[in-house]
Amino acid sequence: MKSLKIFSVVMLLALALVSCGEKNGPTGGKKGELSGEWVLTSWNDATPEFKVYIDFNSDGTFEMYQQVWSFDYELFTGKYVITGDVMTGTYADGSNWACGYRINVVDGQLTMYSQEDQSVTSLYEKCTIPEEIKAEASTTRAMEVVPFL
C-alpha cells in the first residue's frame, strides 16, 4: 500500500511538471512571450523615419498600426503562425506577409529577421499602444497602401 502511495505521488508530480511547461499557441510555436503590444525602435540598426505598432494576441491574431506611407495611421489585421522560431502571417484580406521572420524575444525586446534575399532586422520593444493611435487608425484607404510586414 505504501508503494502505491509513493507511486501516486510521483505520478502527480510528473503530471504537474508536464502541465507547467511552456505554453504553445493554438497553431504551434511559443506565443506566450510574443503576446502583447510592441513598437518598432530600430530597422537595420537605424532609427526608423516611420512608426509601426503591433499587438500580437495569444490567439494567433494581430493588429498592426503603421504610419509608413501616409500622415495617418493605417490599421492592418490578420493572423500569424509560429513554427519553431519562424513567424509567418496572413492579412485579413487573405494576402500573405511579404516574407517570414525568424524571431527572438528576450527581456521585453522582439527581434525579427526577415527571411528574404536581403535580410532586414527589425527591433521592437514592449509598449502600450497609445489610445489616440488606435482611435485614429483607419482601414479605409484613399490609395493602395503597402503593409509593413
Show where each model-derived region lies.
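A ubiquitous, low-specificity "background" feature that marks scattered single residues
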Residues: 8-9, 36
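Bacterial N-terminal signal peptides that target proteins for export
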Residues: 1-8
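C-terminal motif of bacterial Sec signal peptides marking the signal peptidase cleavage site
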Residues: 16-19
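Repetitive helical segments and hydrophobic/amphipathic motifs
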Residues: 11-14
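Lipid interaction determinants
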Residues: 21-76, 83-149
